[in-house]
Amino acid sequence: MEFCSWLKVRSKGGDTVLFHTFSNQEERRNYGGSAFIEIQFCKLPAKTKRKDLAKKINFWQNDSLYIDDVETFFHEYSHIFNCGMYSNLESGVVDLYGVNYYAPNFIDPIIQRLKEEKTAEYEIVIEWLDKAKRYNGFYILGI
């Protein structure tokens, strides 16, 4: 059985694996359990009230990106994902231990910043964000 579907790119002087995908829950559990940040499509309707966006999340989706290197992710991406809405409806830098929602209108500006700054494995994030345009934005779900 293949252990995990890896997304690999050469980044900042070496092979790194910052982002992971899993084809099922068993794969994820075998790899590392639940100690991941999850970047997940928001599949709720566009008319969902803002206060309800954080209440109806289904964690551990197979089309999500998973991050186990929290420190590197924060260092590389916190200044880019600095416009998310927390579950208390406040906004700010990505909360690594909470729910962060990014509305669809934030996707293109985030992609533009990624192209300019070329953060670690930014190509993977851009490809995933292009798919997020089909949905009602996305979440970054902390550990």
Please give the residue ranges for each predicted region.
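Acidic (Asp/Glu-rich) sequence patches and key acidic residues
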Residues: 1-127, 131-135, 139, 143
